[in-house]
């Protein structure tokens, strides 16, 4: 299966039990910042934004004072799982990032999608990739 299929079929799909509700944007990005696959709506990010995200996974709390920046958008960092999941909030939307052995799985959402639904979609794919050794 191509990485684009993972994004299309597992991240940008309808939320289970909520037809028509889906993430706004999604991507799978290598730890080095190389994009493996992304939705057409995923923001163009700067290398320093990806470096900040990777630093926060290695040093949890790194982004808390400044916020998480992606594609020029600033998200307030909210409770995640140290070294495994970063969550951010901006207005009625937000972002979830799950770290796997080789990649970061990104999901960006706006209402009516809830933070919990975004977490479920992103973390389910991230856990699957971890099980596959990726």
UniProtKB/Swiss-Prot annotation:
Name any one GO molecular function. Answer: actin monomer binding
Looking up Pfam families in the UniProt record yields: Profilin
Which post-translational modifications are recorded for this protein?
Phosphorylated by MAP kinases.
- Keyword Disulfide bond in the entry? The reply is yes
Using the record's annotations, give every residue carrying the modification Phosphothreonine.
Answer: 114
Q: What SUPFAM superfamilies would the database entry show?
A: Profilin (actin-binding protein) (SSF55770)
- The cysteines covalently paired via disulfide bonds are 13-118
In the record, which residues are listed under signal peptide?
none
Q: Where is this motif: Involved in PIP2 interaction?
A: 84-100
The entry's localization annotation reads:
Cytoplasm, Cytoskeleton
Give the miscellaneous note.
The variability of the residues taking part of IgE-binding epitopes might be responsible of the difference in cross-reactivity among olive pollen cultivars, and between distantly related pollen species, leading to a variable range of allergy reactions among atopic patients.
Function noted in UniProt: Binds to actin and affects the structure of the cytoskeleton. At high concentrations, profilin prevents the polymerization of actin, whereas it enhances it at low concentrations.
This chain's protein is named Profilin-4
Q: Which species is this record about?
A: Olea europaea
């Amino acid at each position: 299966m191509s990485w684009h299929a993972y994004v299309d079929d597992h991240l940008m799909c309808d939320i289970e039990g909520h037809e028509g509700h889906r993430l706004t944007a999604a991507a799978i990005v290598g730890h080095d910042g190389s994009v493996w696959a992304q939705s057409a709506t995923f923001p163009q990010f700067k290398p320093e934004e990806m470096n900040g995200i990777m630093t926060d996974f290695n040093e949890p709390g790194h982004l808390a004072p400044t916020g998480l920046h992606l594609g020029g958008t600033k998200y307030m960092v909210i409770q995640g799982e140290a070294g495994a999941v970063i969550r951010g909030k901006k207005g009625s939307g937000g972002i979830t990032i799950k770290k796997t052995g080789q990649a970061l799985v990104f999901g960006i959402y706006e209402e009516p999608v809830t933070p919990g639904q975004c977490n479920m979609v992103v973390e389910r794919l991230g856990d699957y990739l971890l099980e596959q050794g990726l």
